[in-house]
Amino acid sequence: VKSTNLMAFVATKMLERQEDLDTCTEMQVEKMKTSTKARLKTESSFAPRTWEDAIKDGELLFNGTILQAESPTMTPASVEMKGKKLPIDFAPSNIAPIGQNPIYLSPCIPNFDGNVWEATMYHHRGATLTKTMNCNCFQRTIWCHPNPSRMRLSYAFVLYCRNTKKICGYLIARQVAGIETGIRKCFRCIKSGFVMATDEISLTILQSIKSGAQLDPYWGNETPDIDKTEAYMLSLREAGP
């Protein structure tokens, strides 16, 4: 049900900005909307709701944090990548779900050598995470996508630690062929927290609370430091994979 509501929200918001979509992407989004409506009809026997209700619930679940098809509410910044300026849209109060599991609420721990900024690469299900702290809590995220005019699914997430309020990671969800598959993959990566797991026990715990995740009110509506974030993303892009 939650997945259906999320897809209803995403499809609707993207189609509100049809002028920003190319023909191929628009057709894929229309197909996604049609399949989501079919799923909604199938689910009506055990979770009756209207299309409008599904959209509202989908918006509440993630508050538009993963894919914001509306105009950004904060001033866009940009980074330099291979000689090109790329926009970064800073989503307001971009919160990832934390649930009530202690793995999320424990304090951050520096890397074994004490260098909290040493980057470590993790790969999981179509996403790459550059992790700069061994942090057991979950993150606030700021997202960007390099090609907003075509809504291509190539996203970068700057991760902030809940406890120290410092940048602790940089997540890239790679572009995939199907737009619906890509959006679902982004949802799973952020909602489940799988990409943040540093060991098998953490992975098991994070898996167990996937369906019961809730939004974390910790950050409120604080404004991110755009200059520091832009500089950090630029340094990561220059360093390469």
From Swiss-Prot:
Its main location: host cell. InterPro entries: Flu_C_NS1 (IPR005187), Flu_C_NS2 (IPR005188). It is found in: Host cytoplasm; Host nucleus. Keywords: Host cytoplasm, Host nucleus. GO terms for cellular component: host cell cytoplasm; host cell nucleus. It holds the Pfam family Flu_C_NS2. Suppresses the RNA silencing-based antiviral response in Drosophila cells. This is Non-structural protein 1. It comes from Influenza C virus (strain C/Mississippi/1980). The gene is NS.
